[in-house]
Regions:
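Conserved hydrophobic beta-strand positions in leucine-rich repeat
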Residues: 65-68, 75, 97-99, 116-120, ...
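Leucine-rich repeat
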Residues: 87-89, 107-109, 130-131, 150-151
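N-terminal capping/linker segments that flank leucine-rich repeat
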Residues: 5-10, 16, 21-96, 113, ...
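Short helix-onset patch at the extreme N-terminus, typifying the N->h transition
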Residues: 7-9, 141-144
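N-terminal secretory signal peptides that target proteins for export/translocation
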Residues: 1-2
């Protein structure tokens, strides 16, 4: 009987000792060159986060992400074009994404299933990946790119397409 109680207590201690670590790892993402390798995208995310760490609370507030060339110029001044949106997966609550006029060659939104409106026109995209389990995409503008194929089979809510 004592062994059983001891086993239960040890299991509970193990579970509760892992909770704070797991919670902090999931809710705080450093905005650094490892998570956001493109320097301009990283600078923009730092600006909208108001910090060098993206908290879960702040990520929830970011539903509109405008990293279009014109908005970057307005917010940050003259900068080189963005070539990668790697790290966008940490902005999982974004519903409206505008990344037009940059120099993106790939755009991976497989972990951004909440995106409803996407404007990625005027890039050099050869690949656009959407969540293969399904997504919320309603409006897609992807003209002036180098896409040769686009799988929209998991986008049942799509009502407007301009490519």
């Amino acid at each position: 009987m004592k062994k059983r109680i001891l086993s239960i207590v040890l299991c509970l201690v193990m579970v509760f000792s892992l909770l704070p670590f797991t919670a902090s790892a999931a809710s705080n993402t450093p905005i650094n060159d490892m998570n956001f390798p493109d320097p301009v995208f990283r600078e923009y995310v730092r600006k909208i986060a108001g910090s060098s760490v993206l908290t879960e609370e702040k990520a929830r507030q970011i539903e509109v992400l405008d990293v279009s060339a014109s908005n970057i110029k307005k917010v940050l001044g003259d900068r080189d074009p963005i070539t990668s949106l790697r790290g966008i997966r940490y902005l999982k609550y974004v519903k409206d994404l505008n990344c037009s006029g940059q120099k993106l060659t790939t755009l991976n939104l497989e972990l951004n299933s909440r995106v409803e409106k996407l404007n990625c026109s005027g890039n050099q995209l050869t690949d656009l990946w959407l969540d293969p389990r399904g997504n919320s995409l309603k409006y897609l503008t992807c003209s002036v790119n180098e896409l040769t194929a686009l799988d929209l089979s998991k986008s049942p809510e799509l009502t407007e397409l301009s490519c």
